[in-house]
Swiss-Prot record:
GO molecular function: adenylate cyclase activity; ATP binding; metal ion binding
Transmembrane spans: 40-60, 863-883
Name recorded for this polypeptide: Receptor-type adenylate cyclase GRESAG 4.1
Pfam families cross-referenced by the UniProt entry: Guanylate_cyc (PF00211), Peripla_BP_A-cyclase (PF25493), Peripla_BP_A-cyclase_1 (PF25495)
Entry's cofactor comment: Binds 1 Mg(2+) ion per subunit.
Keywords: ATP-binding, cAMP biosynthesis, Glycoprotein, Lyase, Magnesium, Membrane, Metal-binding, Nucleotide-binding, Receptor, Transmembrane, Transmembrane helix
Residues in the Cytoplasmic compartment per record: 1-39, 884-1242
Extracellular side: 61-862
Subcellular location: Membrane
Transmembrane helix among keywords: yes
Gene name for this UniProt entry: GRESAG 4.1
Membrane topology: Multi-pass membrane protein
Organism: Trypanosoma brucei brucei
Length: 1242
């Protein structure tokens, strides 16, 4: 029994007609309380409310009162059986209560003489027979009767309980309509979500009648929801409403052909039942071989019609029925759903009523509602309406006043009926508008739409998945927020036990944080069960039939399948990484693990190293291991490539170090025995083998104290925090422990969990989620923070090395960081054996050649001893990443007669930020460059050049350029910069400017922090866009790219120069080059004529409003414009980072002299190797000169450019005294390890 406010069958609490009497026992208790000391009196008096709670209620006597219920639950246009079923259920409920309220009042039902009685006649009859009495209306049934009765209810101060209308038109706030079921749009929402996310269908069609108001309303709602979910219907079968007229067969067939050509996999059916074309359409689906297997989804009002029409069509065509093809919704549980205690309660009441009552002859047998589930559902609805009415009457303050009764209904009351909760009527859905809508709360106190499927017996069966819920605060589907879903596919290999188990454990972690089955759930997992032989073929088939955004978990040999995005793949055998943009690795690459383990070995004593490797790439793996060991002064004594059936146990011997790569289940036991036999031996395994065989390793080393001790000899490298350590200071681990049972705490389950958390973070701001946009977002975000674990940087850029472009040297599709060496024993003891100190945030790996007289590490260490002297002269030296270029020349505008749209960008106050935050700016600028380049690729634009922190971008399409600029600002706004220091500095710069300029008002310095966070975040970038003809478009033989000359690039650069940080300006020429349709899709503010320096006539300018509500200071017309023709005559931006023409300051001269003195002792090849990292980290462009090697003159120019850039930042810091705000504090020496700057995996 659920005791709630107003709860309890047949009794109420003191706020109603009932009151509590003090029993003799209660009176004795109170007398005893009076005899106690004051201290105990006070204490026990606090318990008085609790004592009262347990006193038996005694209800007021209302035996002389009669409450009339007017039954308008009928409609001559509906099946008689359906009408009878609802009324029979209603009567069964009230009969179970003896037709009495809890206070003894009689409940009397006024029924229509026949179902042909007009609504007006029955209503007048009910009002006439209820003068001076409380009258409640049951129904009406149907949209038209509900619309008709609304005004009549208001005139007579009446309430209609459980009206049924199939239009949202009557579901707005009306205190006279007391609905107990969800609205029609909620059912549509459930059907849309089921088709899109649970069936995962990329092609869903619609069918409706144009002239019908309800159909139009449903169509518009469906289109809105699908758009929000990032989808569009593949086709729409829409015909004019027949209105009783014959529809020409030829017209229907023409529309049918157009509809079928879109290859729909499912159709949402919400055309009106009276439309002849609805039946024609359903039969046509069954007749056409192209659509006979298509899913049909329809709301609850279509259940009878859909099942009958479909089954008749199949019988006429001699086709068999396919279970699961027809899908409908419901507003109450099915009468046969015995999982619900409310349904079991209904069955008891219904059985008793039908056994003892002959009013409903059609339902003489109690099991009738179980055989006909469609009518059984109607009975459940009627019974539930009776229970709600009974509870409402029990909670009314009096049973004679209609106004008082109506007001009592809307006091946020819930009615508990077994496990079904109805209530919270009258809640505010929108406080700002005071818009009140009755809200239905179902199981677990949330609005609920049930999903049903038709089985082979043409019976409705409840679905375990797909039902839609939303919280009590959402009273209407109009207020429910839905988002674009992500459908993830994981493979279950049925013919490989290791892979099958791995998939199950991975999915256990991935699914553990799936949200409850509510409306804002975004991530949905589908499994593909297949054998290894058919894996690739099956995946290609799924690609066409499912809207899969990512393939996850165990992937075997399918990474080369095109047009799929793979996230966190788990190979069954070791593989070296090849950069495929659509493959995103979350764990360390094998080459990185071997590199880190080589570092570990170089710091420990070793008696010899050998390798046992199994897999298709065994020879390549051995070569990579050998290079890693040689790099750190360790030699690989021997290696053995094993076949699939070769046991490793035959080759394990002695106390040396052995790399065992590509394990099978027998190998795990062999490794454990080897370490237990040879206590000084060490075995190194890839982390992927730990993932696959973790349970076997734990079992193999957990047999005795000796075996546990030997587990210290099993070593591997990982980037994970410890998944099993309790009270660990890791937010992700703590979250993992909250969602996953302790018995499942293992690395593979944790990887699945971490993958889902990563996806939740990545898609949080995505409006459309499929394979390509998902990969785009990951590369755009680059560094992704998930709880306390970082992934990245991910980069799909190319790098410039010297004067040539080298593909994939800077590209990075892996996100593991902080790789450390663990032992199995340390893992079991919940501690790290040893941390190598390696922070893997690199693009690749740098190896020494075999036979070299010294290692790479030695070279860098020696160089750093010298370079510390240089850094002493420059307290502002901080590295950043190499400028990358996207030289896809197919995207470059080449025709001189075609207009070119040019974009110039620059970071606002970049020099001041470098001076204030030398430790933050390298990563911030690197993130800036990655986001810009990712968008350049996404919108098929062309990167002309970078100068310092500035970009020059060309586009054939003006609209693509505008879209790029708009999304650029949004990317910066939503990016996790990892600090508020940049924002603090920008506000500080505004304050400083306001002190010097009286007319200047800081736009953001005094902004409320919450408002600021919605409008501003991190780096502020100004953007200028101009469209026009270029005087010259030249292909540069050195860079192999295209450059643009003349007034157009000059105008674009000048436009950018007057903008404020975060502002996008476009000239009138750029704006007018957009089509009328393009201009409708953007929001601009006309700024009028703007006088630009060096331009004779004012230029009409527009501001692209990328972030609504952002305000800017006046345009910076006073900003000095630097027109740099450079060495080749091309135009650059007004960036303050160009060093090609600038003079060397005093600080720069000191830096240049020191560098030249130090480098003079190195050969030319070493000078290039030592200087390149500075150019990369400080974003200094190399001289554009074709040379086979760096000669003395070339090196001197590179040093000069570095000195200009570093000297400028040093001078700015000295002039502004920015050390007070610098994130580096007062330190004058900054040393950053250089070994991870230009590393490459071979």
């Amino acid at each position: 029994m659920h005791w709630q406010e107003g709860g309890g069958r047949g009794c109420v609490y003191t706020h109603g007609n009932c009151r509590r009497n003090l029993t003799a026992r209660a009176l004795q208790a109170l007398q005893h309380v009076e005899a106690l000391t004051c201290h105990y009196c006070v204490s026990l008096l606090h318990l008085l409310p609790l004592l009262l709670m347990w006193m038996p209620p005694v209800c007021a006597d209302d035996s002389a009162v009669t409450v009339n219920v007017l039954s308008m639950m009928y409609n001559p246009e509906y099946y008689v059986e359906k009408v009878n079923a609802i009324n029979a259920g209603f009567d069964a409920s009230l009969s179970a209560h003896g037709w009495k309220t809890g206070s003894g009042a009689t409940i009397s039902v006024i029924r229509p003489p026949s179902y042909n009685t007009t609504a007006e006649d029955i209503f007048q009859l009910g009002v006439k027979q209820s003068e001076g009495k409380l009258l409640v209306v049951f129904g009406p049934l149907g949209t038209d009767p509900v619309v008709w009765v609304r005004d009549k209810l208001k005139e007579n101060d009446l309430v209609a309980i459980a009206p049924i209308a199939y239009s949202s038109e009557v579901r707005g706030w009306n205190p006279h309509l007391y609905s107990i079921s969800v609205e029609p749009n909620a059912e549509l929402l459930a059907l849309i979500r089921y088709a899109v996310v649970y069936l995962g269908l990329p092609r869903v069609g619609l069918m409706y009648a144009k002239g019908n108001g309800f159909d139009k309303e449903s169509y518009e709602f469906t289109m809105r929801i699908m758009e929000i979910m990032g989808r569009k219907p593949c086709g729409v079968f829409a015909v004019e409403s027949s209105g009783g007229r014959d529809v020409l067969e030829g017209q229907l067939n023409t529309k049918w052909g157009q509809f079928v050509a879109t290859r729909p996999q499912a159709v949402l059916l919400f055309s009106s039942l009276e439309e002849e074309t609805t039946g024609w359409f359903v039969k046509k689906i069954a007749q056409d071989n192209r659509t006979v297997d298509m899913y049909l989804l329809a709301p609850s009002s279509f259940q009878h019609f859909l099942i009958k029409t479909w089954s008749d069509a199949l019988v006429s065509l001699n086709r068999t029925f396919t279970p699961g093809q027809l899908i409908t919704t419901g507003t109450v549980p099915l009468a046969s759903d015995n999982r619900s205690s409310m349904v079991r309660h209904f069955q008891r009441d219904m059985d008793n009523y039908l056994d003892t009552n002959s009013d409903w002859k059609g339902f003489a047998k109690p099991e009738h509602y179980l055989k006909d589930d469609k009518l059984g559902e109607m009975m459940v609805f009627g019974w539930l309406a009776g229970e709600v009415l009974f509870e409402a009457l029990n909670n009314a303050p009096q049973l004679t006043n209609r106004t008082s009764f109506m007001e009592s209904l809307y006091k946020q009351r819930r009615y508990v009926i077994d496990d079904f909760v109805v209530g919270d009527f009258g809640g505010e859905c929108d406080e700002a508008l005071h818009y009140r809508v009755p809200c239905v709360i179902a199981i677990k106190a949330a609005a609920w739409t049930h999903m049903r499927v038709v089985d082979d017996s043409l019976s409705l069966k409840p679905m375990k998945k797909g039902s839609v819920t939303w919280s009590v605060s959402e009273c209407s589907s109009a207020n429910v927020q839905v988002s674009a879903p992500l459908i993830g596919l994981y493979v279950v290999l049925t013919d490989d036990k290791v892979a099958q188990r791995a998939s199950m454990r991975w999915s256990l972690g991935a699914r553990s944080i799936e949200e409850a089955d509510d409306v804002d759930k975004r991530i949905f997992f589908h499994s593909l069960k297949v054998n290894l032989k058919n894996l690739t073929q099956s995946l290609e088939q799924v690609r066409d039939t499912k809207a899969v955004a990512a393939v996850l978990g165990v992937t075997a040999d399918i990474l080369s399948v095109p047009n799929m995005t793979f996230i966190g793949p788990i190979p069954l055998f070791p593989r070296l990484n090849k950069f495929w943009r659509n493959v995103i690795h979350l764990q360390p690459l094998l080459a990185h693990e071997l590199y880190v383990l080589a570092v570990y070995l170089s710091n420990t004593s070793s008696t010899g190293v050998k390798a046992l490797v199994r897999g298709g790439e065994a020879s390549e793996v051995v070569d990579t291991l050998d290079k890693s060991l040689v790099t750190f002064g360790v030699s690989l004594d021997s290696s053995k490539t094993l076949g699939d059936g070769d046991p490793m146990s035959s080759y394990l011997s002695g106390n040396g170090d052995v790399f065992c790569i590509g394990l099978t289940p027998p190998d795990v036991a062999a490794v454990a025995r080897h370490l237990q036999t040879h206590l000084r031996a060490r075995v190194f395994v890839p982390f992927n083998d730990i993932l696959l065989f973790y349970q076997e390793f734990v079992a193999g080393f957990n047999a005795s104290k000796e075996s546990i001790a030997s587990s210290e000899g099993l070593l591997f490298a990982t980037s994970f925090p410890h998944w099993g350590k309790k009270n660990r200071k890791s937010d992700m681990v703590a979250r993992f422990h909250r969602h996953v049972n302790e018995s499942h705490w293992d690395p593979l389950t944790f990887l699945g969990f971490a993958t889902t958390r990563l996806l939740q973070v990545v898609i949080s701001n995505m409006r459309k989620v499929n394979a390509e946009p998902l990969a785009d977002r990951i590369y755009t975000e680059s560094n992704i923070r998930v709880d306390d674990v970082g992934f990245g940087p991910f980069s799909d850029a190319e790098c410039v090395s010297g004067t040539s472009v080298s593909a994939n040297e800077c590209a990075s599709n892996f996100g593991a960081t902080n790789i450390s060496v663990w032992s199995m024993g340390a893992c079991a003891e919940f501690k790290l054996a040893q941390d190598t100190g390696w922070d893997d945030t690199v693009y690749g790996l740098c190896y020494s050649a075999r036979g070299s007289t010294h290692t790479v590490t030695d070279s860098w260490n020696n160089f750093w001893v010298c370079i510390r002297l240089v850094i002493i002269y420059c307290p502002w030296c901080v590295p950043t990443h190499l400028p990358a270029e996207r030289r896809n020349n197919n995207r470059a505008p080449k025709e001189p007669t075609d207009p070119v749209t040019l974009i110039f960008t620059d970071i606002e106050s970049s020099t001041a930020l470098w001076a204030a935050h030398p430790d933050l700016m390298p990563d911030a600028v690197a993130a800036h460059h990655r986001m810009v380049r990712s968008l350049i690729g996404r919108y098929k634009c062309y990167e002309v050049k970078t100068v310092g922190d500035s970009f020059m971008i060309a586009s054939k399409s003006p609209f693509a350029a505008v879209q790029l600029a708009q999304e650029l600002q949004l990317c910066f706004l939503h990016h996790d910069w990892g600090t508020n220091a940049l924002d603090d500095s920008y506000r500080e710069f505004e304050e400083q400017r306001a002190e010097g300029e009286c007319e200047y008002t800081p736009p953001t310095a005094h902004m409320d922090p919450e408002v600021y966070s919605r409008l501003w975040n991190g780096l502020r970038v100004r953007v200028g866009i101009h469209t026009g003809l270029c005087d010259i478009i030249r292909h540069d033989e050195v860079t192999k790219g295209y450059d643009y000359y003349g007034r157009t690039p000059n105008m674009a650069a000048r436009t950018e120069s007057v903008a404020n940080g975060g502002q996008v300006l476009m000239t009138h020429a750029a704006y007018m080059s957009l089509s009328a349709e393009d201009r409708k899709q953007i929001d601009v503010t006309a700024l009028g004529d703007v006088a630009l320096r060096g331009v004779s006539d004012p230029v009409k300018m527009y501001q692209l409003n990328t972030v609504p509500s952002r305000n800017f200071a006046a345009l910076r017309l006073d900003r000095e414009y630097f027109f740099d023709e450079g060495e080749d005559g091309t135009t650059t931006s007004t960036s303050d980072h160009s060093s090609s023409r600038a003079d060397v300051s005093e600080s720069g001269q000191i830096i240049a002299t020191a560098l030249q003195s130090l480098l003079s002792t190195f050969k030319t090849a070493h000078r290039e190797k030592l200087l390149l990292p500075y150019c990369e980290r400080w974003r200094v462009p190399l001289p554009r000169k074709a040379a086979s090697e760096w000669d003395d003159a070339y090196c001197e120019e590179v040093v000069r450019r570095i000195a200009v850039k570093v000297g400028r930042v040093a001078d700015h810091g000295a002039d502004s005294g920015s050390e007070s705000s610098s994130t580096q504090g007062s330190s004058s020496i900054i040393i950053v390890p250089f070994y991870d700057m230009h590393l490459q995996e071979y």
